[in-house]
Amino acid sequence: MEAIRIGFGLPNVHSVPLCLTTTRCLFPRQRLLHSHTPSWKPAKQQDFFVASSSKKSSDDLESSLPTPHFSPSLWGDHFLSVSLNRAEFDELEREIETTKPLARDKLMSSESSDKEKIRLIHLLVSMGISYHFDKEIQDILKHSFTKLDDIIVGEDDLETISIMFEVFKLYGHKMSCDAFDRFRGNDGRFKESLVRDFRGMLQLFEVAHLGTPCEVIMDEALSFTRNHLESLTSGNASTASPHLLKHIQNSLYIPRYCNIEVLVAREYISYYEQEEGHDEILLKFAKLNFNFCQFHYVQELKTLTKWWRDLDLASKLPYIRDRLVESHLVALGPYFEPHYSLGRIIVAKINMIMVVVDDTYDAYATLPQVKALTECLQRWSIEVSDKLPDYLRIVLGSLFDVMGEIEREMRPLGRLYRVKQVVEKIKIITKAYQEIAKWARTGHVSTFDEYMKVGVLTAGMADYAAYCFIGMEDINEKEAFEWLNSNPLIIKHLTAMFRLANDVGTYETEINRGEVANGLNCYMKQYGVTKEEASRELRKMYVYRKKVVVEEFMNSHDHVPRQVLLRCLNIARIFDVFYTEGDGYSEPKGKIEHFMTSLYLHPIPLS
């Protein structure tokens, strides 16, 4: 099958060792290791710690911030102790190979109408198994869209129209939202009789999150459905079944397109199993697929945990956020499918090492140190590293080592161009980090617009997309990066989305440690409004930006590969997961912990 073969317990993915030897390297690792810096020699690394109480020079004290104290990792080395049974993995793979043709037969059945096939596609998407039949689905929808008017004529079922609108939009076909006019009365409002159609209301609520700036009816649909669904779940006299009520509550808490795909699938499988008349073959296939994916995730976490433990940065640099497993969850956002396993490992590694760099700029280094570090990074060289204190040499050396390791992995795959592109984007983002650090150390509160010009650069969504592209086999790298480097609208608005969500979510933490360079704070100061008022305004900006992301996703299908666009749409789904209730990445206890537990620790029972 097309899914990757992982040798459990072995440090390899796609049969490529995670550490490949090479005589040539783009990165100055060896020079750094052998430069005249005793504290960086491997034999002494384990003895070095950054102590917040250590004495600092006058330069160190210049514009310094209070040392942050993040909670320790929830996971530690847990995944190193998790045993994976290769026989169970092989059995899962065999069952998937046996069940997949049966599922495909249902999709391709000549006895099914176009409408039935589209509803089936929606089910496959919901349960996380549509990727197995991507070509078949695209062919079906391309054919069906040519006769859409005939398919929907006379259709008065809200759930069916909503499903069709969602599925066509998800695959790049522009179904007009005029199809929803049939559900509005003479006053232009949605008919109150719809509120008794619980499934139709829920489906309309979900698809309303895929609205674009010009689709005003989607805003009306969202308000209409949310109000009635909230009333439904808060009442005691509901006629909806308990499992449907729970499903509605989950959707109100975090709607489908504000959630990571695999988390949606995990919840939907449990819901679908309780539906009367569910398809046993498709349900079994979805369960097998989830457990198969989970095997991959745990193996990836075993590999990552060993890598992170060997780096030992959590003890050497105790001011950083030790969030390796959370970084893997972030990497699941763009792609959850098994064949992107190598990509997730790469994304998680770069994300984690950039968290180290970000925390150093944000919360620990003094302004002179920030400037010296930035100079080294802009040159991508250690020539000026003598200006750095020992702990910054560890930060710099670790970044060079990680990128050098990835370069060695990518060389035999012919993907060095992708790694070079990521390096250039790291230079851009760290230069912006310096500007924000300067504002923070000097107490400068800029205007909101001035802040956003720099803040969007630190958001790094172009960087994140580039990380994702490294591990993808199904793209043309030159075309993908030419498009990415053209600064397309979808990336601009993704970047703004992250900046807005992050600044609202991290406001309390950042202000408490003296970081005034925060978008929410800048807005409050500029307009003289309360935190609550500023939060509402930034949320409006966020919602608008997301609509543009959806619009650009739709408008770009004729010149940008679907696999590239999907990464962007999926990245947009990450932000609400982590930032709707504070800073879920930095403080994952609670919701994020629950999500990680459901994905990594609990397989779905097959019977």
Curated annotation (Swiss-Prot):
Q: Which Pfam families match?
A: Terpene_synth, Terpene_synth_C
Which parts of the sequence form the motif DDXXD motif? 358-362
Asked whether the keyword Lyase is assigned, the reply is yes
**Which BP terms does GO give this entry?**
diterpenoid biosynthetic process
This entry's comment on the bound cofactor is:
Binds 3 Mg(2+) or Mn(2+) ions per subunit.
Q: Per UniProt, where does Mg(2+) 1 bind? A: D358, D362
Task: Give the pathway listed in the UniProt entry for this protein.
Answer: Secondary metabolite biosynthesis; terpenoid biosynthesis
Where does the record place it?
A: Cytoplasm
Q: Which cofactor does it need?
A: Mg(2+); Mn(2+)
Keyword Phosphoprotein carried by entry: no
Q: What is its main location?
A: cytoplasm
Keywords in UniProt for this one? Cytoplasm, Lyase, Magnesium, Manganese, Metal-binding
Query: Which GO terms of the molecular function aspect are on file?
Result: magnesium ion binding; terpene synthase activity
Disulfide bond annotation, renumbered to this chain: none
CDD domains in UniProt: Terpene_cyclase_plant_C1 (cd00684)
Expression sites (tissue/organ): Predominantly expressed in flowers but also in siliques, roots, leaves and stems.
| Annotated EC | 4.2.3.-
Gene Ontology CC: cytoplasm
Q: Where does Mg(2+) 2 bind?
A: D358, D362
Binding positions (Mg(2+) 3): N502, T506, E510
Which family does the record claim for this protein? Belongs to the terpene synthase family. Tpsa subfamily.
Domains: entry comment: The Asp-Asp-Xaa-Xaa-Asp/Glu (DDXXD/E) motif is important for the catalytic activity, presumably through binding to Mg(2+).
From the Swiss-Prot or TrEMBL record, give the protein name: Terpenoid synthase 29
Query: What organism does this protein naturally occur in?
Result: Arabidopsis thaliana (Mouse-ear cress)
Q: Which gene encodes it?
A: TPS29
